[in-house]
Amino acid sequence: MVSPQTRKEEELLEKQNSVFYLLTLGRKPYGSYLHIKIELDEDEKLEKEIYADNIKLENELRQLKRLYEVYQSVEIDDAQKAIQKEALLTIAKILSVFDF
């Protein structure tokens, strides 16, 4: 039996189809920075920037790119849902750097 809390979490996952995010890695004279902008809808936007040396997100970004490519080629709903969950976990790893 599925608990109400689990059901609610599943529903929230379903509604996250239209989240857009932009991740920028840059360099300034005093160090590296990572900027993220997330648009949940037209009215709700989150932006955050952190400054740090040696920001290591290359693996996560490569994994997101691979997941996106695989998602486009898969036509089976169950496989697409599994890829979506993996992509959300990878995005969560990236967001953990920002302390959201």
UniProtKB/Swiss-Prot annotation:
Organism ancestry: Viruses, Viruses incertae sedis, Fuselloviridae, Alphafusellovirus
Protein name: Uncharacterized protein A-100
Role according to the record: This protein may be involved in virus assembly.
Source organism, top-level taxon: Viruses
Matching InterPro entries: DUF5517
